[in-house]
């Protein structure tokens, strides 16, 4: 009897051939060049102070904080969505389906509903930021830990329950919003729209290391994600505990989505948009090739939208207008091409 060598997750090949690898490198370098160009443009364009003066660098420094926020948001959405697609075996859904945005809206609406206009101030600050993050992570973790712990439930059941619970939270939020004073509602609306200006720079020293740690963990476990993408039976035969690995990845996804949603507000289609484009550009199932492309696409999209809105339409920070428009169109195109969810 001939013994065969055990198959491992590291036996997969990232690229088909040298041409495939070269095309991926060209796309990666091109995105890096575009990203750097947009960073320079956002920092220097329309700066009223002479180049090199103290005033010029003070203005540039204030703009750098927005660039850092966009980098954090792009990384969180890109890595979370790609990982979420892997464990759910569905490239149409997004992590928002677990109810992060609905819960974020409920928390902020309840604060304004109970405390009035002062509630918008209460929801800002380090303590409030981490409170929202903890609530979102706990909600998502309890949801899929409970549903995936039973042999009678699966990922699809978890997604359906998430949709129903998200709809319920959104209905409660809408009910409270209808009872608000018009002025209070205007204040609340500005908070509920994904906006780079919503981010408080005092959150960054906490958000950056947490997001970076989770992102590094996902990169380090890229081979395991490659195995998970092959399905439960195959990943189990490769020596992985499929259910445990799925829960670990979902915990990482929930942390990333909670951090970015609490930081800038909801951006429903950002992750879906960059992940869909990354799959087409990378043209591989290797997460080590997909992750950097997805992150750079997200960063280019955010910085490009920020530049256009800031210097053409003078609507600083409201990048969700462009992101949701493009993302929604791409979503419809993908649905029409596939003909199913």
Q: Model-found features: residue ranges?
A:
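Alpha-helical transmembrane segments in inner-membrane proteins
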Residues: 1-341
């Amino acid at each position: 009897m001939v013994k065969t060598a055990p198959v491992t997750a590291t036996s997969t090949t990232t690229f088909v051939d040298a041409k495939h690898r070269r095309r991926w490198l060209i796309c990666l370098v091109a995105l890096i060049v575009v990203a750097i160009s947009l960073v320079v443009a956002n920092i220097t364009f329309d700066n009223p102070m002479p180049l090199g003066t103290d005033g010029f660098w003070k203005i540039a420094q204030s703009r750098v904080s927005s660039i850092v926020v966009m980098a954090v948001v792009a990384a969180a959405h890109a890595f979370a969505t790609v990982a979420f697609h892997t464990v759910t075996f569905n490239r149409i859904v997004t992590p928002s389906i677990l109810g992060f945005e609905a819960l974020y809206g409920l928390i902020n609406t309840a604060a304004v509903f109970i405390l009035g206009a002062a509630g918008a101030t209460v929801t800002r600050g380090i303590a409030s930021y981490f409170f929202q993050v903890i609530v979102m992570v706990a909600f998502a973790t309890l949801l899929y830990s409970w549903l995936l712990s039973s042999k009678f439930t699966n990922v699809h059941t978890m997604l359906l329950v998430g949709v129903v619970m998200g709809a319920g939270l959104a209905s409660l939020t809408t009910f409270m919003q209808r009872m608000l004073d018009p002025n209070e509602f205007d204040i609340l609306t500005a908070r509920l729209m994904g906006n780079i200006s919503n981010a408080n720079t005092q959150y960054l020293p906490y958000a950056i290391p947490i997001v970076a740690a989770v992102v590094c963990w996902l990169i380090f476990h890229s081979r395991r994600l490659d195995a998970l993408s092959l399905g439960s039976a195959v990943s189990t035969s490769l020596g992985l505990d499929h259910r445990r690995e799925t829960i670990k990845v979902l915990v990482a996804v929930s942390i990333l989505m909670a951090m970015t949603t609490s930081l800038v507000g909801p951006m429903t289609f950002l992750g879906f948009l960059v992940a869909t484009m990354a799959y087409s550009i990378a043209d591989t199932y290797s997460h080590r090739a997909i992750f950097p492309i997805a992150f750079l696409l997200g960063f280019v999209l955010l910085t490009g939208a920020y530049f256009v809105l800031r210097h053409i339409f003078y609507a600083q920070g409201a990048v969700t207008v462009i992101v949701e428009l493009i993302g929604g169109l791409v979503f419809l195109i993908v649905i029409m091409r596939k003909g199913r969810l």
